């Protein structure tokens, strides 16, 4: 199950974090992060990659063994829904690759990293926060035409 697999990722961390952020679609990864960090001060922030305010929260909660309060989902970065994107997001993904030599795609990782950049610019995270960004892989979305 996703909860067990993600718990293994958390158990291998050698440092603690104030925030862990990850993309959210089916809810399994986020639920695993929430369950694995419930005894810590870490806040879990999901970035919704599909339209689903309310729905995504219910989906994640249904995967958890109990209710936890240290998580939330940000719904402002879905760019129209699952596998949808704008020219702005496409350009962000291309520029990110050019600047960092790390390929990202507009379905999951592009939306996640765009959200991170925007939230940092807005001052969402308190100064000095340690943030772990979970890149969940998958570059199949990079084949989408502009």
Describe every region a protein language model picked out.
Residues 120-129, 140-146:
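Catalytic phosphate/nucleotide-handling subdomain of diverse soluble enzymes
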Residues 2-80, 134-146:
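Glycine-rich phosphate/pyrophosphate-binding loop at beta-loop-alpha junctions
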């Amino acid at each position: 199950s996703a909860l067990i697999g993600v718990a293994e990722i958390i158990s291998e961390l050698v440092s603690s974090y104030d925030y862990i952020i990850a993309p959210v679609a089916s809810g399994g990864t986020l639920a695993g992060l929430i369950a694995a960090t419930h005894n810590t001060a870490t806040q879990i922030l999901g970035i919704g990659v599909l339209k689903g305010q309310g729905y995504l929260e219910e989906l994640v909660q249904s995967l958890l063994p109990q209710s936890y309060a240290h998580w939330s989902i940000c719904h402002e970065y879905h760019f129209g829904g699952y596998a949808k994107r704008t020219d702005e997001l496409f350009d962000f993904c291309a520029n990110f690759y050019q600047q960092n030599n790390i390929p990202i795609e507009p379905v999951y990782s592009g939306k996640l990293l765009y959200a991170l950049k925007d939230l940092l610019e807005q001052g969402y995270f308190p100064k000095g926060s340690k943030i772990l960004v979970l890149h969940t892989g998958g570059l199949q979305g990079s084949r989408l035409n502009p």
